[in-house]
A protein has these predicted regions:
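Ankyrin repeat structural motif
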Residues: 35-46, 76-85, 113, 120, ...
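Leucine-rich solenoid repeat scaffolds
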Residues: 144-148, 152-185
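Ankyrin-repeat C-terminal turn/loop position
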Residues: 50-51, 88-89, 112, 151, ...
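Ankyrin-repeat boundary/"N-cap" motif
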Residues: 19-30, 54-71, 91-128, 154-164
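N-terminal segments that cap or nucleate solenoid repeat domains
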Residues: 17-61, 175, 182
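Classical Sec-dependent N-terminal signal peptides that target proteins to the secretory pathway
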Residues: 1-18
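Surface-exposed polar/charged interaction patches
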Residues: 27-31, 48, 78, 87, ...
Length: 186
């Protein structure tokens, strides 16, 4: 079934470039496509159809413009994410906000959410666990990669607020400072 859908997609690409460029968002969210397949089709759209790697979708009710990189992050398609970075897709403030909010969601999923802008004793214990340390390390590696690709360190306001609540903002400040220094050296 997914091969039929891709054949239809490729055939229609011959007739309507604009329609297929916006289809890149649908490709990313397509659960029937593996990450590797999605990355391949995204690369095809950008390289062969001439689609803009920095295209966005305006969400009027939220007054934000989500881009392909944010969609790849939200669907956890890391190969697609890396392909988009390599094709020059800019990391925007909306993506940084999503990364920040993923910390809040992670805490809530583990039964230790932030309430009234304060960390509960359970949350302060949870951040000592290996599970949290691995999550944080994974997100910080991602942030470092985004900084290396030109993301503005100032975009991480939401994450700073969340980490300040659990007294871990210094780690982020150091990462953002080091990432900005590397960018200036280049």
């Amino acid at each position: 079934m997914k091969h039929l859908a891709m054949i239809i997609f490729l055939i229609t690409s011959l007739y309507s470039r604009e329609a297929n460029c916006t289809d890149m968002f649908g490709l990313i969210f397509n659960k029937n496509l593996s990450d590797a397949e999605t990355a391949k089709y995204i690369k095809y759209c950008i390289d062969d159809l001439g689609c803009d790697a920095n295209m966005t979708i305006e969400i009027p009710d939220l007054s934000i413009r989500s881009n392909l990189l944010e969609y790849a992050y939200d669907t956890n398609k890391t190969k697609t994410f890396d392909t988009l970075l390599a094709k020059g897709t800019a990391a925007n403030a909306s993506l940084a906000t999503s990364i920040g909010m993923s910390f809040a969601f992670f805490f809530r999923e583990n039964g230790v959410g932030i309430d009234n802008k304060e960390a509960s004793p359970e949350l302060l214990e949870f951040i000592k666990t290996q599970k949290y340390k691995e999550f944080k390390e994974e997100k910080f590696k991602l942030i470092k990669k985004l900084l290396e690709h030109g993301q503005d360190p100032k975009d991480y306001k939401v994450l700073k607020i969340i980490l300040k609540i659990i007294n871990e903002e210094k780690d982020l400040e150091n990462l953002l400072k080091d990432g900005a220094k590397k960018e200036l050296v280049q």
